[in-house]
Amino acid sequence: MVKTYLFKKHGLMLCVTLLGLASCKKDDAILPSSDNLKAESTIGAAVDLSESAMSVGSIQSLLSGSTLQTGIVGHPFGSEPYKNISAATQIKLVKGMGMNWYRIGTLVTSTGEVTVPKLFNPLLEEAAAGNVNILPMVYLRTMDFNDTQQESYAKGKTLGANFAAKYGKYFTYYNLGNDLELDLLLPKTTGQSQAHYDRAKFNVTAAYLKGMDDGIKSKDPGAKTMIGAGWLHYGFLRMLEWYGVNYDVVAYQWYSDMENAAPKAPNNIPDITLKLSSLFPNKPIWFTEFNYRYKASYTLEQNEAAQKEFIANFLVKCRNNPQVKVAIAYELLDEPVKSFQESNYGLLKWVTPFTAFKNKISATALQLK
């Protein structure tokens, strides 16, 4: 049984995206990637799973004088690399990196029950004991594009209300869905304008999200909800506002290829944090995913150095914009059973899959000089 811990009001959260037996489509999230080759593994001094990843001082050093909080994404609900890592160890790793938010993906039934309670419940208990906040990313599992808007709203409200009724005592912030705009984009569009989206699919999605938001807040009146997008797909978030979805936080995903392309014509966006501030002046901004995308043409050492540089530089931008409240890196561990990119996103890499790992140099990226 899950103990009742009053730990939902700790402020901002660290997000590790844990997928309930599903995975994010990170390689499809934006700009096309040509890197499909596997990176070579580097063997070095390993650390056992029981050891913390990095010192708390590293992030605190980076964020000195700032109110920005940080987090990490993880996939502990069925992903192979997490099968031998206990909930206690995951929370220890989060705390060891100076983070206090862990973002997890949660699949729930229409009754609001998480599909893997034997993994979810211990994580809640360990997070409470370790003073780490969990950000649940709740999938729109019952949404159907064939539904009417009224039917979609009702389904969303039922799922949201039931989830908050069962678990609301653990959370203040709820992340509604992931990569939702990708299924709505029309071909050869950027996602900046409302004309770039399939209106029929958008209406069904927006109705579901409105219901989900209303349902959560009907059972958890103090709840704050967030909805995300990536690349230049902020048009989706603006359309949700116009539709009447009362989400509270702009959640955004940003990767190194986006950072390189955005400043160039015709985009002319040198700082995505400032662009989002101009579009959403009254909402806090959270980056619920950010990281460097490895290049197959680079050596492993070159990629790790570039990853460290991107993470450090992007966090400086976040720190310098007070509207950005939380920055969540993607992801905790390399996942070599998946794609080339998923094999390399981690701040920790495997020495002996899946029993021993060690820090990448990007694990020290959160240090400002």
Residue ranges and their predicted role:
Residues 136, 178, 231-267, 284, ...:
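Aromatic- and acid-rich polysaccharide-binding/catalytic face
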Residues 21-23:
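C-terminal motif of bacterial Sec signal peptides marking the signal peptidase cleavage site
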Residues 162-199, 226-228, 325-333:
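Active-site groove signature of glycoside hydrolases
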